[in-house]
Amino acid sequence: MRGKTQEDIGLVELLDPVAESVGYEIVRLRLMGGAEQRRLQIMAERPDGDMNVEDCAKLSRAISEILDAADPISGEYTLEVSSPGVDRPLTRLKDFETYAGLEVRIELDRVAEGRKRFKGELAGVEDGQVGLNLEGEDDTTVYFPFEWIVDAKLVLTDQLMKRGAEQRAARVGAEGEDANEDLGDDAEDDIDLSESEED
């Protein structure tokens, strides 16, 4: 699901080791457009789930080098590297576990329970099957093999926004603690010194 076409899948296989070598995971890759205006769109993240502008630039440089050397795409194209965003696609089995409890839209490659498209709350993963509590149907949980899923995306809700804000706050807090630990015992003195310079 990280790649949609055979060409996408081949590019994922080529670029996965490059992304991992610089500390990122490819969430989704799509080669879009016609022969004249192609666009290679890559969504990626760090293992902690974050991805800022500097991360995108770093990964873009690493990917560009291998694409220039291997030349797997015929003709001209534009490379776009971005974060998956808040209402992100879910493309790996672990995503369905990580985001359990949140609202999601899922599309299957076949009919199940009389339809291909579903909306509901993720119920996690059990034996390689993705669980979904169906919207508007009390106590109805359905399970699909991960391989049946062709598209899945989180639904933008207040709960999702709150969770995203909490995760960002936790990361910022952890980064601040790491910075103070790196400074050692002089951390408070350094802060006091900089404050006195502003007066």
From Swiss-Prot:
**Compartment(s) where it occurs, according to its Swiss-Prot or TrEMBL record:** Cytoplasm
Q: What GO biological process terms does the UniProt entry carry, in alphabetical order?
A: ribosomal small subunit assembly; translation
Q: Where is this region: Disordered?
A: 166-199
- Return any one Pfam family short name: RimP_N
Question: From start to end residue, where is composition biased (Acidic residues)?
Answer: 175-199
Q: Which UniProt keywords apply?
A: Cytoplasm, Ribosome biogenesis
Can you cite an annotated GO cellular component? cytosol
Which InterPro entries does this one have?
Ribosome_maturation_RimP (IPR003728), RimP_C (IPR028998), RimP_C_sf (IPR036847), RimP_N (IPR028989), RimP_N_sf (IPR035956)
Q: What is its main location?
A: cytoplasm
Give a short account of what the protein does. Required for maturation of 30S ribosomal subunits.
User: What family does this belong to?
Assistant: Belongs to the RimP family.
Task: Please report the name of this protein according to its UniProt entry.
Answer: Ribosome maturation factor RimP
Q: Which organism is it from?
A: Caulobacter sp. (strain K31)
